Every structure is written in structure tokens, then in C-alpha cells.
């Protein structure tokens, strides 16, 4: 959408005031494959799943706070956990939520979640009685509690999912019977998902909204105009930097970024290390040395930060690592590796894929394409998939050379970083898509996740960052400046640690 058209919309149709029916309309750029975060990651699944399902905990300003579990105890070794569930909590069909459901849910996520490495150490999950659950791990897991939020490990109804149907294709992933603040009222596939307030929700007086409608705009250019005209109230994970400048000039609209500070979104190039070209760490090093990350960050709109290693800047676990920008040495490396330039100056051509709805990725790819061909004579042919599913099939099957991706570091490396490089998450979407495998790196990740001393843990993650950077496992590029664009009268979304990936039971409209 052009700036001129948006400017016209700004003055012709200001955003609406709070609605009479106490509802919220959230814009989506595509329809999610399902609503169950135990079997699929991604912002679309998680923002709806976090409303339909509860977790044992939710994230507060200082870490995990009670949610479905009203309290818990953890032993001094961080290996034994006991959870006490709230009395009277029910699923949306009225069935009581018990410790058996929680045990079932943890096991389901352990087997099926794309980030299953975060639960690898869980050894025993034992219901003591209907409202008490014991969990044991094989090694200390000081960060384990952070995993049990609804966007990662939702509490599922065992009486529905335990019917023998494979959970990753279960019809309840769309026709959800949840445990959270909102119940599924209706859906029109490809168009809308309507959630209604669940009157039996276990937190008194919550949720405060009566309805949330998720409306799909297949043309992302329609979303800014919908926000301006009041046809949508909120759009999360926006990277529409040009439009944001116009949004900020409208007093009825607010643009915020702080809610993504714990998600640590970033962009990287993932090499298929089974490809003969990218099997060589030296070739990967040459590509890294041919890109000036600072210049890239300045060229990409939106205020991104350059990134040189596996953990994004801004994370408390980030440790500075860098690869020097040295195109001359990059060319010498490629010469030694047996990739001379041909008569047209090209060393080799590879295809680079990207998730087709990720417009931010495409803007970076075009920059990288010009830099690679100019500095080292490597041609990256951009391949656009017909739809996100086609891209996902291609990268998980290994039928790709390089793919561009946008990932979240999440609030702990054991959740958001380990899964990208762990052997046990290879060929899983938004996890280890590169098929990288290194037993020493796996062991370092296990040691880091088990370290109870924060400084000792930070030192182990520093060693991991140095090791992965030395191998140039991926080409880390920059942070992503996601923003939430919303009607200014929508309250208690931006103050949630993960924004719309948190339960919106507190969200409400400002009233006169």
C-alpha cells in the first residue's frame, strides 16, 4: 500500500472508538494450520492457542507466575517439581481439568512440539491426585518452568485427544475444546475465527472481553487500511515500517514494540548442510565474511540491530561474537575451496527460499542477493513458494539449498535457541532445518540447560555461541523490529510480556 493511500485513509476514515459489543478484531495475514501450540509453533497458532488453552504458568515481569497451577514446589536440585492445580477449573465442554490432563499434555508436547528439545530431560510425569502433579527430570532443569506457558505447552483435554487419533492431525486442533479464557465459537476456514468469553474460566471476572474475532487478510496491504478505517482493532508482528510512520501520526492508533522484548525475533540464513556446497564450514565462512552486517542493518528499514551469532543482542544470554567483514579473504577462501569464477564472474548458483508471507525476509534477501553477486560472485536465485505450506514441505524434506527465516529466541536459550541446532529436532519446521548435527554441541546445550548457577550458565552459552559461530552453522543477520499496531483504546495487550502470545484475559477497551 502506498504512503499516499494510507495518508488519505488517515484523514478520511479515522480508527473507531471502542465498540458497543465489547469485542476485539485482530487482523491476521493468513489462516493458521491449527490452534494447538503443542504440535505447531509460529505466531498464528500461538496467539490463538494462548486464548483457547491455559498453561500451568504464565509469564510475568519477573518470570513465571501462577496460572492453572496456583502454586508449585521445586527441589534444590531443580529436578523434582510438584504442581498444585486450581480447584474447579474446567475445559470448555464442562469436563474438570485434572492432573491427568496436564500429564497427558506435557507428554504430547514432549513428543510433538517443534521445540521438543526443551522437554528432553523430562523423565517422569505422575498425577498424585486430581489436583496434584509430580514431575521429575533426568538432569537439573532450572528453566523448565518457563516452558509451561500456553503458547508452548497448552493444557489439552485427554478425554478428547486420547481417542487414538494421531495428535498432530487430530480434528480437535481446529475444532478446539480448550482450557483457557476464550472458547471457540465459530470458524470459517480461510476467513475468520471467532472466540467467545468462556463463562466457566477459572479466574473470577476474566476474561474482560466478550469476543475476539481473528480476521484473515490474504493481501497484507489491506491490513493497514483496515486498521485506519476501524475494520480491525489490532495487528501484531507487523514489520510494515513505512506504514508505521503514518500510523504514529494518527492519535487514535498506537504502535508498540516492548511486548516483543522477551521474544527476541531475528533473521538468519539457514544452510542445508547436506548440500555438498554448504557441507564445508569454509564456504559458509566465506559467505559470512562477504556481508557487512552493520551496513545491512542500516539498509533495512525499521531500526534493526546487526547480529553476528546464535543468540540475539538484547537477550541476557547474548555474548559478543563476530566474523570480520573481509570480501578479499572470502574470495581467497572460495578459490581454495575449488569454486573459481567462470567467464561471467560467477562461482556457483544456489536457490534461496523464504516463507512467502514474510515480506521483511524478502527485503533482506534482495539486499543479500546483490551483495553476494557483487562481492564474491555467488548468485542466490530467489525462489518464491506458492504458499507457506509449500515452503514448509520443501525445507522440512531437505529439498532446498538455503532458506531465509524469521525466528524467535524466546525468553530462554533452552526454549528458543537449542532447538535450532539440536540433533533431535532436525528436519522440523522452525527448528533444526539445516540438518546440522554435532554431539559436542548437543552435550554443551544439555550442560547449559542443567546449570543452576546463572553465571555458570551464561559462560556455557558463551562457549556455545563461540563454537557455533566458529563453524558458521548459519548466517545470522539482524534483529526484526516487530510491532503491534492497535486502536489506542485497546488496553492490556502491549503490557503483556509476549503481547498477543499471552492470554488476553486482561485485555479490555478504555471506557469514557
At which residue positions do the language-model features occur?
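Aromatic- and charge-enriched surface segment that lines or borders ligand/interaction sites
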Residues: 71-115, 128, 134-136, 226, ...
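N-terminal lobe/hinge region of extracytoplasmic solute-binding protein
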Residues: 27-76, 107, 119, 177-178
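Surface-exposed binding/hinge segments that line
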Residues: 73, 117-162
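A structural "hinge/loop" feature
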Residues: 30-46, 68-70, 95, 139, ...
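Gly/Pro-rich hinge or "lid" segments in bacterial periplasmic/extracellular proteins
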Residues: 62, 150-207, 211, 221, ...
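Detector for C-terminal structural segments
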Residues: 188-191, 197, 290-318, 360-370, ...
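Structural transition elements
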Residues: 272, 279, 305-337, 354-364
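Extracellular/periplasmic solute-recognition and catalytic clefts
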Residues: 126-127, 185-194, 215-275, 298
Amino acid at each position: 500500500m502506498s504512503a499516499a493511500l494510507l495518508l488519505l485513509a488517515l484523514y478520511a476514515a479515522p480508527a473507531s472508538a471502542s465498540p458497543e459489543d465489547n469485542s476485539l478484531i485482530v487482523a491476521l495475514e493468513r489462516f493458521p494450520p491449527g490452534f494447538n501450540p503443542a504440535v505447531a509453533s509460529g505466531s498464528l497458532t500461538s496467539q490463538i492457542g494462548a486464548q483457547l488453552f491455559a498453561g500451568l504458568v504464565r509469564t510475568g515481569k519477573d518470570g513465571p507466575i501462577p496460572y492453572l497451577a496456583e502454586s508449585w514446589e521445586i527441589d534444590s536440585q531443580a529436578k523434582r517439581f510438584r504442581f498444585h492445580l486450581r480447584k474447579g477449573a474446567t475445559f470448555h465442554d464442562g469436563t474438570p481439568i485434572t492432573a491427568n490432563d496436564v500429564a497427558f499434555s506435557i507428554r504430547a508436547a514432549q513428543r510433538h512440539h517443534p521445540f521438543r528439545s526443551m522437554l528432553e530431560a523430562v523423565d517422569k510425569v505422575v498425577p498424585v491426585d486430581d489436583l496434584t502433579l509430580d514431575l521429575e527430570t533426568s538432569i537439573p532443569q532450572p528453566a523448565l518452568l518457563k516452558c509451561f506457558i500456553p503458547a508452548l505447552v497448552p493444557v489439552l483435554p485427554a478425554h478428547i485427544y486420547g481417542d487414538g487419533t494421531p495428535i498432530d492431525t487430530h480434528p480437535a486442533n481446529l475444532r478446539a475444546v480448550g482450557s483457557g479464557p476464550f472458547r471457540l465459537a465459530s470458524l470459517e476456514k480461510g476467513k475468520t475465527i471467532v472466540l467467545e468469553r468462556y463463562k466457566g474460566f477459572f479466574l473470577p471476572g476474566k476474561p474482560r472481553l466478550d469476543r475476539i474475532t481473528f480476521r484473515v487478510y490474504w493481501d497484507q496491504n489491506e491490513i493497514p487500511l483496515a486498521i485506519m478505517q476501524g475494520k480491525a482493532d489490532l495487528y501484531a508482528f507487523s514489520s510494515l515500517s513505512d506504514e508505521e510512520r503514518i500510523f504514529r501520526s494518527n492519535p487514535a492508533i498506537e504502535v508498540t514494540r516492548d511486548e516483543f522484548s522477551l521474544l527476541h525475533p531475528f533473521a538468519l540464513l539457514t544452510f542445508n548442510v547436506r548440500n555438498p556446497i554448504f557441507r564445508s564450514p569454509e564456504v559458509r565462512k566465506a559467505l559470512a565474511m562477504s556481508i557487512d552486517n552493520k551496513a545491512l542493518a542500516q539498509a533495512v528499514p525499521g531500526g534493526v540491530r546487526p547480529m553476528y551469532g546464535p543468540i540475539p543482542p538484547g537477550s541476557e544470554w547474548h555474548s559478543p561474537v563476530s566474523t570480520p567483514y573481509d570480501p578479499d579473504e572470502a574470495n581467497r577462501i572460495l578459490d581454495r575451496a575449488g569454486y573459481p569464477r567462470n567467464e561471467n564472474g560467477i562461482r556457483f548458483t544456489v536457490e534461496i527460499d523464504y516463507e512467502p508471507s514474510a515480506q521483511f525476509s524478502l527485503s533482506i534477501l534482495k539486499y543479500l542477493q546483490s551483495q553476494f553477486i557483487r562481492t564474491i560472485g555467488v548468485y542466490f536465485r530467489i525462489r518464491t513458494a506458492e504458499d507457506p505450506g509449500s515452503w514448509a514441505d520443501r525445507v522440512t524434506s531437505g529439498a532446498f539449498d538455503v532458506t531465509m527465516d524469521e525466528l524467535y529466541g524466546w525468553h530462554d536459550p533452552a526454549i528458543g535457541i537449542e532447538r535450532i541446532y539440536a540433533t533431535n529436532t532436525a528436519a522440523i519446521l522452525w527448528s533444526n532445518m539445516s540438518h546440522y548435527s554435532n554431539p559436542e554441541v548437543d552435550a554443551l546445550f544439555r550442560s547449559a540447560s542443567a546449570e543452576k548457577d546463572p553465571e555458570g550458565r551464561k559462560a556455557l552459552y558463551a562457549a556455545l555461541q563461540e563454537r557455533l559461530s566458529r563453524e558458521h552453522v548459519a548466517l545470522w543477520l539482524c534483529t526484526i523490529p516487530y510491532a503491534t499496531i492497535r486502536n489506542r483504546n485497546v488496553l492490556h495487550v502491549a503490557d503483556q510480556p509476549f503481547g498477543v502470545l499471552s492470554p488476553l484475559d486482561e485485555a479490555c477497551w478504555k471506557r469514557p
